[in-house]
Amino acid sequence: MPDFLGRSVYLTEFEKQKAPLAASPAGGAPVFISLHIGEEFGPGYADRARAMCRWLSGQGWRILADVSEVTAPLFGLDDAAQLPEALGLWGLRLDDGFSLDEACALAARMPIAVNASTTTPAQAAALAAAGPEVIAIHNFYPRPETGLDPEFLQESTRMLQAAGMQVYAFIPGDQQLRGPLYAGLPTLEAHRGAAPLAAFADLAVHYGVDGIFAGDPGVSPYEQAQIARFCTEKVLPVPVELEPAHRGLYGKVFTCRPDSPQGLVRFQESRAYAKAGPPAEPAGCGARLRGTVTMDNRLYGRYSGEIQLVRQDLPADGRVNVIGRVAPRYQLLMDCIQRGSRFCMVPPSAKEAADAL
């Protein structure tokens, strides 16, 4: 599972990105930049790009630069192999203009990345054998409806990993989206409009990628904090709007019972917690729609106090209280809770809570 959220930095957005990047502990995480976006070229381009790279390196980010055959001459260099030393880069992401032989030669000297969607099994094997750190990165897709299908992402990721390569992908941001479309920059079309935490967890749990970048310039501090907790503690935070009487459940770590059915997440520890207080009285026994958090009341006998997260619509039951709901943009997270895995309920962001009113 990835242990970081990489970021994407754009020369045209850099001044606006500096403050939030400075506030985010880099810790050696990678940052993705592009050094061949034609619309950014102009007077002073090389100097501005150098200054950006110096600043990012000084903040502790490892810079992975997307380059083409025209990049080196822009900086007065003869060869792409000179770029890391000249600009303080960690590695190069090579566009499709580089031959396999050129890519293998570079891989022997530095970390490189290639296009995960176009690399064949034979090419992947050759590249993985050429150097110690070779990554395949899936593209991000600015235009709605053009992102990858789940099946293609799974199949290509498995193939590349089997050949010995690491595989990275992109999730959308939730602040300062990248123009001109401002529709998010995900790899997977299903993630367009999803919260960064939800998209990150989905890629990590269901697709097994080795690294994840945010494609858009901005990720809110709330999302960064939840992703960081998932990476470091291996506890999945699930933003839930709980009824006031049950907000003491926020932050408690639960385990999904190993025998949970597909349509429910059963909170393994919940009945033990409930024994510390009086039995739950019937209240709010409404329809149990997908995303509903429920607690069995005293009418369910020994099950009183059991908490469940509902993954498929169920009818109302007088023995079951509705005590909360997963915030809409995070419902993808429910499917990321696997049998035996740990998770916790957290308050939604202030913006999410306001939008729900």
Question: Model-derived features: where do they sit?
Answer:
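Short secondary-structure transition/capping segments
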Residues: 8-9, 75-87, 105-119, 160-165, ...
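C-terminal functional modules
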Residues: 244-357
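A broad, low-specificity signal for short, low-complexity segments enriched in glycine/proline
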Residues: 53-56, 75-77, 172-175, 266-273
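Active-site beta->alpha loop and helix N-cap motifs at the rims of alpha/beta catalytic domains
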Residues: 2-133
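Electropositive, surface-exposed helix/loop patches at the edges of structured domains
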Residues: 65-81, 96-104, 152-155, 205-215, ...
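Catalytic alpha/beta core domains of metabolic enzymes, predominantly
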Residues: 117-120, 124-248
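Residues in well-ordered beta-strands of folded domains
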Residues: 8, 137, 239, 308-310
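N-terminal start-of-chain detector that recognizes signal peptides
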Residues: 4, 65, 108, 140, ...
